Amino acid sequence: MTAMNYPHAIILFAHGSRDALWRRPIEAVANDMKQLSPATQVACAYLELTEPDLPTTVAGLVQTGVNAIRIVPMFLGVGRHAREDLPLLLQDLIIQYPGVTFELSHAIGEEPEMTRAMAAIALKSNP
């Protein structure tokens, strides 16, 4: 990967878990994104208990020449992690990488498309 191929990237940021199976849905979303948009570099990062963490993921992307990163919190709602922990991490990254533009999206669960999709899935499983 070079800067020419991937000047922008999207990081799917999730909580993390000691259970290795927990990360599969997040990685599945990343893989689907890569198939839908091969020109978009997509990576996963985790707050705790799972690697890589956000600073490690950002460092790897910057090394490939990425100069703009959008972080998508893969949380259903805005709890303490999305409201407090992630903005603090982001502040540190902005200082560490002044040449990189960072954008923080809303928590994925707050997006109307996501709430509609969850409603449809829940209704589908209704006997």
Walk through the language-model features, giving the residues of each.
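Active-site-proximal alpha-helix that buttresses catalytic centers in soluble enzyme cores
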Residues: 1-127
